[in-house]
């Protein structure tokens, strides 16, 4: 039976733990690709790119790697898109730190997921993250 949501019939409905796992997987995948470029010992990445010489782009720039990354799974790709947006905003605002922003976001999300799946009050976790974020931004 296909249920409609506000007149819209979804192709696929993903809820609960399954959606959390898919979102986390998307974050882990883009972070894995990007974090390999981190720091002075970071690795060069080769990206298939029809717009460049011989169809390839060779880069050590995390935001370039992030922008080129996509997933087939629409839920995982939603997380990838959010990470791309965060890295692009970091690049625009600071001019650097895109790879670090993605790696830190992955760590925060993983820690948050560990807390949420435990016996801790989810609202308390969100309040704590909001207060810590405010302190970091202020300092």
Where does each model-flagged region fall?
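N-terminal glycine-/lysine-enriched basic segments
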Residues: 1-139
């Amino acid at each position: 039976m296909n249920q409609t949501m506000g007149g819209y019939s979804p192709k696929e409905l993903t809820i609960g733990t399954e959606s959390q796992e898919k979102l986390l997987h998307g974050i882990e995948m883009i972070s894995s690709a990007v974090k390999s470029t981190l720091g002075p010992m970071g690795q060069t990445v080769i990206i298939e790119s029809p717009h460049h010489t011989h169809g390839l782009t060779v880069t050590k720039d995390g935001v370039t790697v992030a922008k080129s990354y996509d997933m087939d799974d629409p839920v995982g790709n939603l997380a990838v898109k959010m990470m791309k947006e965060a890295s692009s905003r970091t690049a625009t605002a600071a001019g650097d730190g895109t790879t670090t922003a993605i790696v830190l976001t992955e760590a925060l999300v993983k820690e948050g997921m560990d807390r949420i799946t435990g016996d801790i009050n989810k609202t308390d976790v969100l309040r704590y993250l909001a207060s810590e974020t405010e302190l970091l931004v202020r300092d």
